[in-house]
């Protein structure tokens, strides 16, 4: 992550040796790191003064509109303006090991003329700098590659679905409370099992304001904030050590379920103690919700309209065909307020919307930005993605979710005579070929025999193709897990997967 403009102030309270005031040039990233010996409390007055201010995204929209108003004849101009910040706390052995408090702001400007695109950005909202960015974007048009599909998004008449993205309680949450909460998560986790150590306990939150305006008529602005906690564990038994982890997310810290996160992190590690390498065979796998989320993340690239148009997806030419078990309905729904990545607009300012990608096993659509839609002769699905003011729009899924079933994970496991419960995978993204669909990934978990969890296993791989996996799904859990990612987790049962061990 890069932070383009940062202003920080830390007051000299207990454990902080002296006050520090920093004004950082563009491109720098500020970390305040406190050792176990000195870090006890951080003054949150400065941070809360930013986090609790009224919505200033309309100020950003005024800036964007002023830029767009300077468009010359024959130009399309887009101004994307944002401001945001984050807090990150890491606790180890009851003390603050790492603390980050940072803010950034900036503007990115696209200019399109005669099929060529120029782009420039700056990590400041200084008026002179903005004028320079616009001039640079115009100059960069000359270096752009001619593209018949180049252009900005235009209003498409799809109405936004009102959502609440800003939580005042989170905005006012004191830094000292964030630290106390992180320490409490560590304490709870340590109390779950005497064999468990906590590698790190973390609290993370962020806030952002954004505005986008274009010469094509888009005018949008808004703000949001979010938070989550995570904990990583180590379980020891003699010379053996196994790892675990867990998350909890919420609109505000009061929604965290710390006992659940602590229990899951401890169980993930202790369950694997004594794990052996399993025999190789074809078997049924039960994917833990976190693993399902990872697979959906990989699958999302194959449903990307731009990748499809470039021949980078095995779903090319499959629209209208059965590509999954009839139980499968897969949606991309950033309008669901429970999704961690919920939003009301995409990266181009179009309304976010619920898109049904696969319905009852049939491939219905691909996600599109305005650019990929022009390439494929379709319409934008409100799926433009953007990494911030320093980047131009891409395309991708925003909040994927499988339509859940009704059974719990325990009930699904009871229905498996012989299989393996996959608790963790390693190297999944690098182990998948999105064109052929082939995948092979390292895994660890628990064997299942006669519907009961048996011995732990590790150092094996599972392999199949994504196409085959979608068709071989035999059960879907109702245990939705809202993770801090673009894909929601739940338990999946898949037959006939190759497990390679000894």
Please report, for each region that a protein language model flagged, where it lies by residue.
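Generic hydrophobic alpha-helical membrane-segment signal
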Residues: 5-8, 13, 387, 484
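N-terminal small-residue-enriched
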Residues: 18-502
